[in-house]
Every structure is written in structure tokens, then in C-alpha cells.
């Protein structure tokens, strides 16, 4: 009985929120492809949320099959003339088409139409993230604190560099910081990376070089996280904690900035993994995302929505990676075609697709292994 209850709790607490969030993000991504493709005159034969066998679906008057499929780990739009869901052209089928039919295929469309259709998916994810953040800022506002130091931890990077209580941080690496959160965000994704902090002290600006210390922290759910710290603390007196509200236009602007922060943070995160500043076991896959979805669900709908915005940016960036089978790989092919004046040969594209598929599968296996290790570790 306990096993059944535990399994039911895992299903409703983790899997269901994960599937709902992921399905929404996949739907928006694929809808971007579909709408721009339709605007460009490219026919779609299938729009699927999930992979594998169809569970339920219908065919619209345009001949597009809309369906939910059995494996809820992605989705696809299959365009007229495509061999598979990765938008690889069916060369044998294309040879039997009329000129009018070929013009309705992805491969037969003008180069700019193909590029616009492929890029529309990731762009839709970025737009969704901006809108989500804008709504959250518009409804809830945010708590901020001034970047003024109340305490410097002993033997910390800040202490070694000469930071003192009362100092106001005005910039890091020449980039202005307006709040203490700006400092935490910038430093947190740069463990072991030399930075220059500009502080204001008695009306004078001082540039203090330091290296954030890599440290492992534990969040409220017990998850271990690696981040950089410099060892400064603020408080109510020094930081002037306060709640601010945003007008609709200000909320949208904050949504754009927040999305930019997520993009920058993601690139720095990847760079830290590649350079070894962060351990590779920090890379998570579907199990860890499902776990995060369930944990956020316990904090309320706003936390789940915020997670959806972050994941939407991640999906957009992932799909823009220059790897064949992903949107970014197709865009690279189109760029090469624009430069050469003709597309890559079918053989070269086939080899690239196979290499890309192996890379994606390898990354998924590695990330899933990290997920399992973190659960049993």
C-alpha cells in the first residue's frame, strides 16, 4: 500500500506538472513553426505534441493532422515533402511532385521563407518567456535591495580585495548594477572567473579585482547547487529592502531584461561546464526537470509559471544549437546555402543528421545518468 501511495504521489506531484509545463512550451514552439510556415505558403501534414504512436487526434480542413502522441518529451511539425519529423527532405517523393506542389514544401520554398519558418520556433519560446515574466512583474512587482554592503565575510574574495561595510557596488566588469540581486546574479554564474568590482566609498570610486569562490549550496528542497560567491551581505538598514510595482510597459521591459538575464546565465553556465569551473554533474535532464516542476508546484502556481518561463528560454536556446536535427542545424545549412549559392549535397546532409542525432542521444544519456545519480547519491 505504501508503495502504491508513493508511486501515486510521485505521479501527481512530479510527472503531471512536468508534462503540463513541457507540453505548453512544446506547443508554443511548434506553433511558431506552423504559423510562420503557413504564412510562407508551406503546407503542414502533422502537428504533434509528443513522439511515437498517436493517442488522439483529428485532421483539419487543410489536411494537417493534429495529435497527442505517447511519449511526452517533445513534439514536431511535419511539413509537406518531409521524410520525417526532423524536416529532412524526402528526395524520392519530391521528384514526383509538380512545380506547384514543390513550392508548398519546406525544401522547395525560398531560402528566407525556410529560415523564417525554422527560426520561428525558438523565437516563439523567447516571446512566451517575455510575456510570462511581464505578467508576473505586472501582478506581483518585485522586492529589491540596494547593492550596499552591510558585512564582509572573513577570508572571502571581497575581504581579500578590500571591500568594506558601507561600500556601494556600482558596477562589475564595467556593467552597472542597480540592486543587490544584480550582484548575486552576476557573481553566481562566474565561479573562479576573475572580475573587477567598482565600489563607491566616501564619494570616490574604487576598482577592486577579485575571483568569486566556487561553493556548493543546498536549496530549500535539498538540491545541491554550485555557484560563485564573493562574501558580502546586506541587510534592511544598508540595503533598504522595498517592494516596487511596474506599469504594463515597465513590466514588459522587465520581462525583456529578465529573459536576457536567463539567456546570459545559460551561456555562462555552459561555458563553466566546458571550462571545468562547474562540475559536469550539474547538467540535468528530464528527470531533474520533472523533479524541479514538482518542487515548484508545492510553492504555488506563480512558481510553476516562473519555471515555465525559464524552461521556455532553455528550449529556445537548445533548439538554436548548431547541431543537425535541431533548428540551429537547419539554420547553419541555410547559411551555407546562402554563401555557396546552392545547398549541401544530400549525402553530406545525411552524414550531418546522423552525427547530430548521436550527439543529442549522447547528451540525453549523460544528463539522464546525472539525474539518476543525484537521486540515488
Curated annotation (Swiss-Prot):
Broad class of where this protein is predominantly found: membrane
Topology of this chain in the membrane: Multi-pass membrane protein
Annotated ranges, domain PDZ: 129-202
EC top class named in words: hydrolase
Keywords: Cell inner membrane, Cell membrane, Hydrolase, Membrane, Metal-binding, Metalloprotease, Protease, Transmembrane, Transmembrane helix, Zinc
Cofactor(s) in the UniProt record: Zn(2+)
MF term (GO), any: metalloendopeptidase activity
UniProt binding sites for Zn(2+): 29, 33
Residue ranges crossing the lipid bilayer per the database entry: 118-140, 299-321, 351-373
EC numbers for this chain: 3.4.24.-
A single GO BP: proteolysis
GO cellular component: plasma membrane
Pfam families found in the cross-reference section: PDZ_6, Peptidase_M50
Family according to the record: Belongs to the peptidase M50B family.
PANTHER family, alphabetized: MEMBRANE METALLOPROTEASE ARASP2, CHLOROPLASTIC-RELATED, REGULATOR OF SIGMA-E PROTEASE RSEP
Protein name per the record: Putative zinc metalloprotease Atu1380
Amino acid at each position: 500500500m505504501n508503495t502504491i501511495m508513493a508511486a501515486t504521489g510521485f505521479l501527481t506531484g512530479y510527472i503531471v506538472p512536468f508534462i503540463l509545463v513541457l507540453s505548453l512550451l512544446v506547443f508554443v514552439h511548434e506553433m511558431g513553426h506552423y504559423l510562420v510556415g503557413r504564412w510562407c505558403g508551406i503546407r503542414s501534414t502533422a502537428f504533434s505534441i509528443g513522439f511515437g504512436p498517436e493517442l488522439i487526434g483529428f485532421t483539419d480542413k487543410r489536411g494537417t493532422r493534429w495529435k497527442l502522441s505517447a511519449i511526452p518529451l517533445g513534439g514536431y511539425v511535419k511539413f509537406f515533402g518531409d521524410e520525417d519529423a526532423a524536416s529532412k527532405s524526402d528526395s524520392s517523393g519530391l521528384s514526383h511532385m509538380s512545380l506547384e506542389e514543390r513550392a508548398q514544401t519546406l525544401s522547395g520554398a525560398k531560402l528566407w521563407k525556410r529560415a523564417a519558418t525554422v527560426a520561428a520556433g525558438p523565437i516563439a519560446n523567447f516571446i512566451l518567456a517575455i510575456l510570462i515574466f511581464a505578467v508576473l512583474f505586472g501582478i506581483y512587482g518585485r522586492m529589491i535591495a540596494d547593492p550596499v554592503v552591510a558585512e564582509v565575510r572573513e577570508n572571502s574574495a571581497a575581504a581579500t580585495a578590500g571591500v568594506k561595510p558601507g561600500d556601494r557596488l556600482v558596477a562589475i566588469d564595467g556593467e552597472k548594477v542597480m540592486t543587490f540581486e544584480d550582484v548575486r546574479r552576476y557573481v553566481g554564474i562566474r565561479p573562479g572567473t576573475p572580475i573587477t568590482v567598482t565600489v563607491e566609498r566616501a564619494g570616490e570610486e574604487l576598482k577592486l579585482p577579485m575571483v568569486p569562490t566556487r561553493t556548493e549550496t543546498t536549496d530549500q528542497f535539498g538540491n545541491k547547487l554550485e555557484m560563485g560567491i564573493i562574501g558580502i551581505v546586506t541587510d534592511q538598514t544598508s540595503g533598504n529592502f522595498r517592494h516596487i510595482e511596474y506599469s504594463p510597459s515597465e513590466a514588459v521591459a522587465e520581462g525583456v531584461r529578465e529573459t536576457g538575464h536567463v539567456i546570459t546565465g545559460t551561456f555562462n553556465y555552459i561555458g563553466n561546464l566546458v571550462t571545468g569551473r562547474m562540475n559536469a554533474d550539474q547538467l540535468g535532464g528530464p528527470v531533474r526537470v520533472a523533479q524541479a516542476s514538482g518542487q515548484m508546484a508545492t510553492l504555488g502556481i506563480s512558481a510553476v509559471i516562473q519555471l515555465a518561463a525559464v524552461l521556455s528560454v532553455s528550449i529556445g536556446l537548445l533548439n538554436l544549437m548548431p547541431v543537425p536535427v535541431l533548428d540551429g542545424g537547419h539554420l547553419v545549412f541555410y547559411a551555407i546555402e546562402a554563401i555557396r549559392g546552392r545547398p549541401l549535397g544530400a549525402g553530406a546532409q545525411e552524414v550531418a543528421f546522423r552525427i547530430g542525432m548521436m550527439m543529442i542521444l549522447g547528451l540525453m544519456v549523460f544528463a539522464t545518468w546525472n539525474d539518476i545519480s543525484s537521486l540515488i547519491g
